[in-house]
């Protein structure tokens, strides 16, 4: 069970939103590269970067900062989402040292693009399913489709997707706990590993996620709880390793 710190980028700064609302942000740092260093020093094995401006614009906006983080920490596994709409964007990030690219909006609009990306970059493609009341949202969460997250996830079973990041928008940034029921339901419905996102805020959430690891939940993205200090990364990862039987 990997706990993955999130760095959300908006206008060049590290921010956290509430329920994905671009007008409800808290700025935690003007130096995202230094923030990445903070999580590296805390022992993280992986980092989740989101270009919030890019998610709305449909193309990379904060790519230069992401490139700097990837260059500064070449041994860190980095996954990036936000504005990933074509193969050239994926190629640019891969050449910059980014490990995994998260396809969200295009997974809804052009599911075949996910297959194309997996064929071009095998082992490096993640699908991001961001759901509000079970329905997948797109365009930086500004639009909610009629597509059910579980139904869309099943379409990618044979595509070669590395993982699915499942975000419960209603929990994101609200510090109300992870929606373990919905995440577990999705994980049980597919064979692709699921990374939970949205609401992880306490050691109790970590325990609940570890209890569901056998259902296919392989990790969890953590944001506001780390920034506000309600969750200590080293302590939480240590607990996850202990509960999941990982040796130090």
UniProtKB/Swiss-Prot annotation:
Molecular functions (GO terms): 1-(5-phosphoribosyl)-5-[(5-phosphoribosylamino)methylideneamino]imidazole-4-carboxamide isomerase activity
Cellular component GO terms, alphabetical: cytoplasm
Presence of the UniProt keyword Membrane in the record: no
Domain of life: Bacteria
UniProt pathway annotation: Amino-acid biosynthesis; L-histidine biosynthesis; L-histidine from 5-phospho-alpha-D-ribose 1-diphosphate: step 4/9
Entry's localization field: Cytoplasm
Substrates-to-products reaction catalysed: 1-(5-phospho-beta-D-ribosyl)-5-[(5-phospho-beta-D-ribosylamino)methylideneamino]imidazole-4-carboxamide = 5-[(5-phospho-1-deoxy-D-ribulos-1-ylimino)methylamino]-1-(5-phospho-beta-D-ribosyl)imidazole-4-carboxamide
Protein EC: 5.3.1.16
GO BP term, example: L-tryptophan biosynthetic process
Active site positions, chain numbering: 8 (proton acceptor), 130 (proton donor)
Record-stated family: Belongs to the HisA/HisF family.
Family matches, as PANTHER family: 1-(5-PHOSPHORIBOSYL)-5-[(5-PHOSPHORIBOSYLAMINO)METHYLIDENEAMINO] IMIDAZOLE-4-CARBOXAMIDE ISOMERASE (PTHR43090:SF2)
NCBIfam families: 1-(5-phosphoribosyl)-5-[(5-phosphoribosylamino)methylideneamino]imidazole-4-carboxamide isomerase, PRK13585.1
Protein name as catalogued: 1-(5-phosphoribosyl)-5-[(5-phosphoribosylamino)methylideneamino] imidazole-4-carboxamide isomerase
């Amino acid at each position: 069970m990997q706990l993955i710190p999130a760095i959300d980028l908006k206008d060049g700064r590290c921010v956290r939103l509430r329920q994905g609302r671009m007008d409800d942000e808290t700025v935690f740092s003007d130096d995202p590269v230094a923030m990445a260093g903070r999580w590296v020093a805390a022992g993280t094995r992986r980092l989740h970067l989101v270009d919030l401006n890019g998610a709305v614009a449909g193309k990379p906006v904060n790519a230069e900062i992401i490139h700097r983080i990837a260059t500064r920490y070449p041994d860190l596994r980095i996954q990036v989402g936000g504005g990933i709409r074509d193969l050239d964007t994926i190629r640019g990030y891969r050449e910059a040292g980014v490990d995994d690219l998260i396809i969200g909006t295009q997974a809804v609009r052009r599911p075949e693009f996910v297959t194309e990306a997996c064929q071009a970059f095998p082992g490096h493609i993640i699908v991001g399913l961001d759901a509000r009341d079970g329905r997948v949202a797109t365009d930086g969460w500004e639009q909610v489709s009629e597509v059910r997250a579980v139904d869309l996830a099943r379409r990618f079973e044979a595509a070669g997707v590395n993982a699915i990041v499942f975000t419960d928008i209603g929990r994101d940034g609200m510090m109300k706990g992870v929606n373990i029921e919905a995440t577990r339901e999705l994980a049980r419905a597919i064979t692709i590993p699921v990374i939970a996102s949205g609401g992880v805020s306490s050691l109790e959430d970590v325990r609940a996620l570890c209890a569901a690891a056998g259902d296919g939940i392989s990790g969890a993205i953590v944001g506001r709880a780390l920034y506000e200090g309600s969750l200590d990364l080293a302590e939480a990862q240590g607990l996850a390793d202990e509960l999941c039987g990982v040796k130090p």
